[in-house]
Each structure stands twice: as structure tokens, then as C-alpha cells.
Amino acid sequence: MKWSILLLVGCAAAIDVPRQPYAPTGSGKKRLTFNETVVKRAISPSAISVEWISTSEDGDYVYQDQDGSLKIQSIVTNHTQTLVPADKVPEDAYSYWIHPNLSSVLWATNYTKQYRYSYFADYFIQDVQSMKLRPLAPDQSGDIQYAQWSPTGDAIAFVRDNNVFVWTNASTSQITNDGGPDLFNGVPDWIYEEEILGDRFALWFSPDGAYLAFLRFNETGVPTFTVPYYMDNEEIAPPYPRELELRYPKVSQTNPTVELNLLELRTGERTPVPIDAFDAKELIIGEVAWLTGKHDVVAVKAFNRVQDRQKVVAVDVASLRSKTISERDGTDGWLDNLLSMAYIGPIGESKEEYYIDISDQSGWAHLWLFPVAGGEPIALTKGEWEVTNILSIDKPRQLVYFLSTKHHSTERHLYSVSWKTKEITPLVDDTVPAVWSASFSSQGGYYILSYRGPDVPYQDLYAINSTAPLRTITSNAAVLNALKEYTLPNITYFELALPSGETLNVMQRLPVKFSPKKKYPVLFTPYGGPGAQEVSKAWQALDFKAYIASDPELEYITWTVDNRGTGYKGRAFRCQVASRLGELEAADQVFAAQQAAKLPYVDAQHIAIWGWSYGGYLTGKVIETDSGAFSLGVQTAPVSDWRFYDSMYTERYMKTLESNAAGYNASAIRKVAGYKNVRGGVLIQHGTGDDNVHFQNAAALVDTLVGAGVTPEKLQVQWFTDSDHGIRYHGGNVFLYRQLSKRLYEEKKRKEKGEAHQWSKKSVL
């Protein structure tokens, strides 16, 4: 086993860290309990997220205080003014958006959740002088899907019944009329929301507010999947379940088609814009961005069906002519949709306009400047590390602020880079292990710097070019004080060397009052999906994993291992799992368990593995290896066969079923020997109302196992009525963790040769 040693080197060139470079272990005697970690998060750091606004003074933001009042505060002077008093806030308000000149507030009320990001609501416009409220749509009934101010504030675009409307001066124009169950205008359908856009809207105003670009999705021909709801939010079940008919394209099935539309607000003229980057049936639009300061150019980032080819198509709004200005081939793996395109404008003396984007075309995700007119891009950053986020673009100072893994893949430090000189400057001490983020004011003169771990998070306010904080925004002093009463598990990080020479990041959590002379059971907690990351030096929530390391009757070590295919270690590390999901990931988890078993403080006979979603799938693939390295498996909401999952996620990593039939067969969980032989058995948990990873996955897997003769001693199954992928309906979440705790306790106490019922004894069969 190869262990990496973290060396802390002093640095005086950037902001110092007033916390320790490791997770806290507490200084008291109390142990965390189940109720404090699962039923409620008794000790949880807080952080503010501000909505910066443009006023005459940089540094103003809007927030809603504890009594419900909407207020504007200067983060510099702390001066506060009330925009809407609490008694004037509409009843059942869910969210709000401020008019650009602060004259009005757009409120969402009567919230009803739909999918991961989407919801329905009523919307009201409130004049801040008179405090009068007027409905966005007079006959609304909690059925508006999205609404957004234009940048100039003279219009609101909104979506209702899958149609786009524009409100101006109390007058509403309906822009589309064909919206319905199969046609979506301005909002994504289920698969685009979940897998491509990662949001609930699909419309974008031009910077000057003169045009609106929106996407139109056509689900005609997309197969329907039925999700039954047995209780349907009632205390007594109805005689017949409600059935959700969800257009859900699975592998190699028909995908929705997508079309770009442009609306000129002055004339009300709407124009469909053909994007011929790929065949219409193959086309995926991953991103739409205005590459202009006004409304001259709108660009589309287009992918082919399996997302291993990419084209950026720029549309000249005046002529409606389109041109491919950038192209990528990613057939060595896949191309991620990072949603990071942003307009920069002319650079230096040149009149040529550029936009910025994150691309891994060098093998590592970095910042690139691309000409809006097309041509060779310019690399702003380079090296064997990755840019993870663009936080702010400061055009007057010609700077881009970003987060990266420059120090280590498990860390995030804050930097700026000049697009004039390409000089990279750390804003924090990047030699100290940490995870940071930042939020910049509207004019870029100030920023809230958020320390996110490994110690207790906090937030400070800084002025640009200053290394001394103006003040502390969030100290989390209450958390620091609370931790003085507890003794906490000890979290450490190291790297594990594979025989190939590659390394895996590992996060180890040692039990409270750990003794190297004792032997402890271990729980592996992988996610392991493509591009994901679980091993991070961010603050680790005091959750279930902290509980099982604290309970004196459990005292589990936990190992979280980021296997090959996970993120932030370069394209080659990610893409080697392409077309063969489950193979390398499982091999890496087994290898890590075998190395853990050699440690003197590990009980090698009791090493369990538990994962949720992709982690549940990976747990199944690990058990399927029949390696003997793990003694118990728990699969929560797992995929069991990639033919059952949605096309846009699955084909990105596995290609189509027709082109990779052998890969799909190998990736499915079908081998039962490991399930028969795993010493402590397997627990499978799934919600029947899961609209993401369908219950079908667990049902088919259980049928395979039962049909192949896996015995009741080896297999336990738990469904959760009407629960979605998060398993929370009617107390499901607490039950799930109690059940998991029980299985871990039983596994710890399990003897290798216990008594069994006669049907388990081969001699009497």
C-alpha cells in the first residue's frame, strides 16, 4: 500500500486560513447519536447566499430576514433598508426576484414540487412604493412553470401549460400555442431537466433585453414509463393507485427533438432557427449563450446523441445565418456539458471578440478563450490540474476568477487569471489543504470568501486586492462551541496506488476513541459514477457516517474511495470506464478493501459496502465479483441494468445498445454467485415512486437473485411506498437509516460459522 503524505508549507502571498487544515475531532466527551445525525442535523454549519444587486454603490444585496421582510443591505457599511415589510409579503411566498431598478418584486407563491428542479407556482408582481400586488396571470391556479425578468426590467417571460408568454406593462402576449403534454416551450422536459440543462428553464434574454431565445422540445414518439403512487399523499390509500405517465427515453429509444427559437420582443415575431450540427433525431442542445453585449449573436453548444462529438454553432440574429465556430471529437470517451460559456468581448487592441469556456481538450479541464467568429482558441490555464468553476468575470480588470484543483484533486482553491498576461494569482494560500468558494459583487469590487472545510466553515468579506477581511459574515461560532462538548471521528485523507501506477483518493473516518490495538469493522461508502467526486476536503457533515463511527455499539471505520472514472483527475482517468461501466469501478473498490484488510486495526472478516443510486449499482457490481473482500452489501435505489436507465445519461458513457451490446450485457448485474457467497448477505432498498432510477431495477434484480436460488439468509429486500429517489415519503428516510444501522450491528456481531435452519444445510437438501 502506498500512502501519500501531505506537507503543509507556509505561504504569505495570499489570504491565510484561520482554521486548522484538518477536520475537527472535538474536545469533549459526548458522542454523536442517531437523533443528532439522522433524525435532525443538530450540529450543522450555516452559510449565507446573497443576491447581489446593481445600485449606485457596489456591494449591495437583497435578502429576506427571519421575520420575512425583504431588505437591501450594503455588505460594506452594513446599512439596511426595508424593501418589503413582513406584513406586505404575500402569503405562502416561496421565492422572489427583484426588478433591475428595485421598483418591483416578482414573487412565487403556492409552490408545488415537480421533478428535481422544476415546480409549479402562482406569480405576483409587487410595486414597492404602493405595496400593491397584481397577479402575473389573472386566472393562474398554481400552474405557472417559470418566470423571469428581462435584464432591463420592462418585460417578464413566463411559461404556462408548456407555452411561452411575455408580460409587459400589465399586458400579456402568448408567444406559442402548441404547448401540451408532448411539446415543451421554454421549459425542459424530464430528461433535459435531469441530464442536460440541470435546471427548470430553457429560455434566455439577450443582454439588452431585445430578444428572447428559447428551446422547444418535442416528445412525440418518446416511450412512456408509468410510475404508480399507491398512497398519493393521502393518509388512507385510494382503491386505485394514481399513475404518472412519464415520457422517459431509455437506451436506444426515441429521444425528444429540440429546436431553437428567437423572439424579437418589440415586434413579437418568433423565428425557429435550424441547428444542423447533427441530424435532428440525434441532436442534443446542451447550452445556449448570448455571445454579445447586446443581441447580435446567440450560440448553441450541440452534441450528437452519444455525446462524444460537440459543435458550437453561432447564429447571427440579424440574418439568421449560422456557423460552426468550434468543434470537438471526444470519441475516446465522452464530452461533458459544463454550462460554462460566457461572453468576454474584444481583448486588448484587437477588435476580435471572444468568449470563455472550460474545455478538457488538453486532457485536463482548463479555461480557454474562443473567438466568437471562429478560429484557434487561446489557453488561459494549463497543467495537470483542473478548473472546476468560473466564479466571476471582471471585464474592467480583465480578470477571470475561478476554482481549481491546482494543489490537489480533493481541494478547491481560488485564483484569478488575467486574459491579458495569462498570469495566475492565488487569492488564498493554496499550499494549505482546503476547499474554498466565493461570491463577487455586481461590480466586482467585493467578494464573500467562503471557507468550506475541512474545518468548520466560515465566511469573510474582502475588497478586491486586499488580504485583510473587512469583516466576518458568518463565523459559525455556535458550531465551534457545540463541538467542544463532543468527541468526533477522526477524518484523514490519503492516496492508494493501483498496480497500474494510478492512485485513488481515499477518505478514512476512524471511530471515536480509536485504538490501534483494537480491530474494527469497516463500511465502504462509494458513489463512484463518471465524473463524480466523494473524497473532498470540504467539511464533512455530521451525518450517518459520523454516527456509525460514534455509536459505541457500532464503531465502524468508514472508507470512501474515488475509483477510476471519477472526476477532477484528468480526462484519461475519467474516460477509461467508457463503454464498460461497473468493471474498473468494482475492481478498484475490491482492491481498496483488500488493502484495508491488511491493516492491523481492521477486522478483515467484517468489511461492508453501501451505496445509493450509482453507488448502489457499484455495490452490486462489487458483490458480483465474488471476491470475498466484502462481507455485507447494501444497495439503495440501485441501477441494475443500464437498459433500464435514461438514454442521455447512459449513452454518454455506454454508447447505444446496438453498438455496444457486449458492454451492456457485461455491465448489468446478473451473476449471482457473489450474492450466494457474501457472508453477511445483501440488503436492497428502493422507493416505488422513484421517477429517476425506476423501481423496475430492484424488481428485476431481486427476481434474478431469487430465481437463481439465493437464499433468504442472504437476501433482504425493503421497498418504500411512493418514495422517490431520495426515499423520504412518510418517514422513509429515518426507517432506511435505522434498518441500515441494524444490519451493520448484526454484521459486526455475526460469527463466521453460526447456526442455521436445516434448509440451509446442504446435507439435508
From Swiss-Prot:
The entry's keywords: Aminopeptidase, Glycoprotein, Hydrolase, Protease, Secreted, Serine protease, Signal, Virulence
Record field: catalytic activity: Release of an N-terminal dipeptide, Xaa-Yaa-|-Zaa-, from a polypeptide, preferentially when Yaa is Pro, provided Zaa is neither Pro nor hydroxyproline
GO BP term, pick one: proteolysis
Noted pH dependence of activity: Optimum pH is 6.7 to 7.0.
Top-level lineage group: Eukaryota
InterPro entries linked to this entry: AB_hydrolase_fold, Peptidase_S9_cat, Peptidase_S9B_N, Serine_Prot_S9B/DPPIV
Main location (coarse class): secreted
Compartments, record wording: Secreted
SS bonds (residue pairs): none
One GO molecular-function entry: aminopeptidase activity
Protein name: Probable dipeptidyl peptidase 4
Species for this entry: Aspergillus fumigatus (strain CBS 144.89 / FGSC A1163 / CEA10)
Gene coding for it: dpp4
